[in-house]
Amino acid sequence: MIQVLVVEDSRITRDAIESQIAKSERYVLYASIENAANAEIACLRGSVDLILMDVCTADEESGLKAAAKIKQYNPKIKIIIMTSMPEHSFIQKTKACGCNGFWYKEYGSTALMEVCDRVMNGEFVYPEDAPAIRIGYSNSAEFTSREFDIIRELAQGRKDRKSVV
């Protein structure tokens, strides 16, 4: 059986993932935690084969940073990064960390357990791009990376033209 560590701060999402693992004949839940900072410790304490890691976890811990550290000392552990945020930069950041897959919780057309199976069979599983969402009257696919940067700055309350543009 494949030992799975779930790192997810949302109790509802964690329960749903645990339920899928329990129904599987291939996977068993090793542990389920809400903070990425504890993922390293959990991996050192036992035999973890697969980690399902949220991008942002409890106490604002970065799943990407934790994944990169884990991959440094144990590259054999497979890691799938998950998020419900349709942010396009997460895919590239996940690849840069050496993770094996990426899954959009709310937008993915591929079921989580299918992504797990493919990753455990040696495949790297990534969506081609972030899902398109509506921003006002526009579709997110219509914006450039620079335009998204400007929108983020404005959304954070920055009004100084020099700091935004």
What do these predicted regions represent?
Residues 8:
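Conserved acidic carboxylate
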Residues 32-50, 58:
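Acidic, metal-coordinating helix/loop segments flanking the phosphotransfer/catalytic sites
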Residues 54-56, 83:
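Active-site residues of response regulator receiver
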Residues 64-76:
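Short amphipathic alpha-helix used as the core "switch/output" element in two-component signaling
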Residues 89, 107-116:
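C-terminal output helix
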Residues 134-165:
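Helix-turn-helix DNA-binding segment
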